[in-house]
Amino acid sequence: MASSKEFLEYILEQLSEVEGITYRAMMGEYIIYYKGRIAGGIYDDRLLIKPVKSAIDYVSDIRYEVPYEGAKEMILIEEVDNKEYLTELFKAIYDDLPTPKKKK
């Protein structure tokens, strides 16, 4: 099932105080970037983020989900209605997000 544009827009609004949030549509889902680094994505209208150490430390009740068959587990963020929580979460994880690989 593809994610809705409405859910994407809602998440982007919730993250509006975080500078550098962008997204890319991919096969009916959305990859979320934070200052050029992949932070997570929206899959089946669920916000999932990379399971980096700072995210594991920040999220109190971790629930891992697979975004799609064959993918690595990611952390499901259930508190999408809490703008302050999402803002602080994304700011907390930035330094642990992998930097993009240089294209050859």
Give the residues covered by each predicted segment.
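Charge-dense, helix-prone N-terminal extensions
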Residues: 1-104
